Amino acid sequence: MKISEIGKLLDAQLLAGEEHLDSEVISACCSDMMSDVLAYVKDQGVLITGLINSQVIRTANMMDMICIVFVRGKKPTEEMVELAKECGIAVMCSEKRAFEACGILYAAGLSHKGGH
């Protein structure tokens, strides 16, 4: 699934990473606990979270993720957006709740392949 399609499905606003809109991902994960992402998540392209701090960007970068979707209407700070740009990570915001966002993406064919 293309990053652009994820944005459309979640009615998300793109804040960074326009150059990644045509990038393909095959899996996603959802967590507000970055320690769980580091411990249990493998080979995920998209991180769905409601946590707003720079550790989200750093964790996604360490895990080679190419897109972060902030849910529940949460908006990252300017500093977070700039850090994501430096790391080459697309950043989106959606008003949808995490459960709903995951369900929509799963129904559209995105999986949790490689994760727990």
Please report, for each region that a protein language model flagged, where it lies by residue.
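Short, structural beta-strand-to-alpha-helix junction motif
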Residues: 2-4, 97
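Short secondary-structure junctions
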Residues: 12-17, 112-113
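Histidine/lysine/aspartate-rich catalytic loop segments that bind and position anionic ligands
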Residues: 19-20, 26
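Feature captures the catalytic cores and cofactor-binding loops of soluble hydro-lyases/lyases
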Residues: 22-23, 31-46, 51-116
